[in-house]
């Protein structure tokens, strides 16, 4: 995936300069190991983004922060996901996946998110790289060329890491509530998407990370389902599954098969490794 990393940086340079690079959606029909790593990295980021929302609601009640806008919450959830997925410099798989998350945002047509509280996709890509670079500027020097020198990436990383360690993470060694995983039946031709998600281990990895690093106080479920006709085919989090007794509240992270199916069909469009490995 080394060439893809270079292409990703090149694309981000174009995006940050205002150049038009975005590609029309199409089914590439290509399903190889690199493509699956690429898609897995983006899907993993989305799942951990929703986990950020869940932890903000369950542990710190930040989803109801009076001074935060919806955009503030989305930005915080992106930063949360990046910190949780922060790869070690020598972790090739982790590096490939976090760069795939960046590249995945660079594939998104900005107009799709115009009426949503999220930052523009190229900004979300930039922010991921900024935090990764800020965690260890010497080891991630390759990202420096696409980062604005005025961006205090090291300070942003340190601030977010201190927030997560000080407010959210549990160091008691005690086990909170366990996380349930539910793979709903696929419908409408979503069998391959369901199989991909199961094989990827994204939900299981998220469950393990949540249980190991945070003390969950309420019932929590990661559910994968066919969302057509029920909800927007994306990923989302709900802390509104409220019970009469607050102790029985249920927190749910949902991953839609349709989103995964679309990503598998879109593949590495624009990031194909034309020249092979170096």
PLM features: what roles do these ranges have?
Residues 2-9:
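Bacterial N-terminal signal peptides that target proteins for export
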Residues 31-45, 266-278:
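Short pre-active-site segment immediately N-terminal to the catalytic Zn-binding motif
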Residues 222-254, 261-271:
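Catalytic zinc-binding patch centered on the HExxH motif and its immediate surroundings
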Residues 45-58, 78, 82, 255, ...:
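Active-site recognition of the HExxH zinc-binding catalytic motif
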Residues 33-37, 42, 58-73, 192-198:
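Second-shell loop/turn segments in exported
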Residues 114-205:
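Pan-zinc metallopeptidase signature
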Residues 10-19:
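Bacterial N-terminal signal peptides
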Residues 70-88:
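An active-site-proximal "capping" alpha-helix that borders the catalytic cofactor pocket
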């Amino acid at each position: 995936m080394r060439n893809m990393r270079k292409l990703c940086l090149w694309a981000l340079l174009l995006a940050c300069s205002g150049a038009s690079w975005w590609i029309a959606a199409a089914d590439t029909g290509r399903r190889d190991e690199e493509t699956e790593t690429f898609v897995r990295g983006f899907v993993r980021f989305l799942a951990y983004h929703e986990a950020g929302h869940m932890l903000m609601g369950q542990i710190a009640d930040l989803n109801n922060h009076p001074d935060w806008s919806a955009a503030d919450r989305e930005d915080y959830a992106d930063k949360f996901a990046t910190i949780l997925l922060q790869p070690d410099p020598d972790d090739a798989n982790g590096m490939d996946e976090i760069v795939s998350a960046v590249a995945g945002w660079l594939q998104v047509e900005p107009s799709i998110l115009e009426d949503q509280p999220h930052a523009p996709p190229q900004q979300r890509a930039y922010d991921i790289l900024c935090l990764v670079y800020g965690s260890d500027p010497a080891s991630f020097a390759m990202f420096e060329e696409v980062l604005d020198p005025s961006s205090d990436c090291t300070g942003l990383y340190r601030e977010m890491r201190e927030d997560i360690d000080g407010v959210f993470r549990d160091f008691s060694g005690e086990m909170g509530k366990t996380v349930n995983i539910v793979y709903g039946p696929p419908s409408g031709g979503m069998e391959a998407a369901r199989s991909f998600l199961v094989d990827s281990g994204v939900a299981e990895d998220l469950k393990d990370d949540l249980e190991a690093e945070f003390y969950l106080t309420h019932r929590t479920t990661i559910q994968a389902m066919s969302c057509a006709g029920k909800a927007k085919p994306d990923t989302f989090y709900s802390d509104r599954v409220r019970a009469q007794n607050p102790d029985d509240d249920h927190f749910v992270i949902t991953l839609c098969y349709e989103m995964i199916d679309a990503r598998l069909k879109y593949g590495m469009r624009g990031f194909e490794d034309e020249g092979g490995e170096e």
